[in-house]
Amino acid sequence: MEYSELYVKRIRSLCQKRGITINKLATMSDVKQSTLDNIVRGLTKNPRVKTLHKIALAFNMTLSEFLDFDELNAYSFEDDNDD
């Protein structure tokens, strides 16, 4: 799994657990619908920290809580060529 896919998985998982659509998340986070769609569809590979922070706040989480999940913590950068 690519690094950028981990954010998508996290966002989708939290939306599903909380019964929130991506459209609703865009409204709650004050992130443009198109920006969030691009992240979720994998078109934006490296979302800005500010964007992730807004998404985290919409989930009532700190940025560190949002980024603290098993798949991301276990990710190995050995085969990753992105900088």
Give the role of each language-model region.
Residues 1-21:
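A short, Lys/Arg-rich alpha-helix, primarily the initiator
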Residues 15, 26, 56:
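The alpha-helix within a helix-turn-helix
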Residues 15, 40, 70:
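DNA major-groove recognition helix of helix-turn-helix
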Residues 24, 35, 65:
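Residues in the helix-turn-helix
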Residues 31-46:
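Recognition helix of helix-turn-helix/homeodomain-like DNA-binding domains
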Residues 45, 67-83:
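Short, charged recognition helix plus adjacent turn
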Residues 50-65:
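DNA major-groove recognition helix of helix-turn-helix/homeodomain DNA-binding modules
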